[in-house]
Amino acid sequence: LSFGPRSIAMWRRVLARCGPVRRLSAAGSAAPAKSYSKGLAGVIAGETKVCTVGMGGDGLHYRGYSIEDLCRACEFEEVAYLLIYGDLPTPAQLKSYRARLNEYRVVPKAVRVMLEHIPLSANPMDVLRSTCSMLGCLRPETGYLSNGGEQSSPTSVSTDDAFTSLIAGFGPALCYWHAFHTSGKRIDTAGSDDESIAAHFLRNLLQTDRISPDKVQTVDLSLILYAEHGFAASTFASRVTTSTRSDVYSAVCSAIGTLRGTLHGGANEAAMELISQFKVDDDIEGGMRKKLANKELIMGFGHRIYKKRDPRSDIIKACSEKLSEAEGGRPDLYAISQRIEKVWLMLEEKKIPPNLDFYTASAYNMCGLPTPFFTPVFVIARTAGWAAHILEERAAGKLIRPSSLYTGPGSRALPAWKQAS
């Protein structure tokens, strides 16, 4: 744009017709502030039929089923189906769903090439985010190819298949990237219809068929426990993106990027780092006292919603204990975790119990997962929950656009040198 003398004169005439400028108050706000809560704490930001967090003070339900019942009676695939479609699958529906998941376990060639170019030094969360973007290019969601132009391509997939490909494909992509850069192997990630996501992931990660049922069960239960948790930051991010009428892959990329942040994801990795600082014979009480005195952030304890207990914690704690007692287990890790918990509850003023992340750390370690993979496994699980919320947000059909409380300066006159011009 060019702003010569004639243009400036024209704009002055336009502004003169607009009337007096509305001045901000001295407090900086042009209107009385509406209800405001930092971090949206306690704010109801939408409706959902997917999950209740904190029912009865410390309960957790997916589509009306308690987390305890689901962990006792279901595998992750059944829970993913429940979250996305609203009901637990019949045996026939589950068989069909497993077959569809298996179709997407082979990593596409273009994705393999990309993964081979992502260095081992990269954050595994960035690997998954990049995988999601690449899959969105290779298999665009039908109806979301372009704005106002062609809405599908020969490689377009349905919304349903887009979700299925992500839930099934994240684990194999992560394992392919890891194997290529640690051993130089281009692994075949094909599976079978009856192989669970947990079993398939461990087989590809550890490169062995000899995996104990206890380890498979632990990872499977963790996927159920991490699958959904209401309007958590990543889920809300996916809903915001969805509300703009964007595609599935963009919404999931938003969620992954949000979960990458250490205040949302990464707590189980931080818990493992804490546990690794001690040995069984160490003065854990003294070490924890020092950390608290230095006001260090202790991850793996407490939750914004659960004030008494995290209902998921006892389930994963039992898995950690069972693994520690098995052949080749790490009883030292479980013992150290127990002592840290005991000391924390003794020293911490509010007596906040451990959350899901704390005992997940030792459980994942005993399953053979590298610590940087803890949060990516969270992604594999939570993609099912994100899918449910994306579908729900699309049905709502309203753009999420909250207001903000202005705290900047009040109205100011232009500097003298600008007035003169």
Regions found by a protein language model. Give the residues of each.
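N-terminal mitochondrial targeting presequence
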Residues: 1-31
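Hydrophobic alpha-helical bundle cores within soluble ligand-binding/oligomerization subdomains
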Residues: 26-421
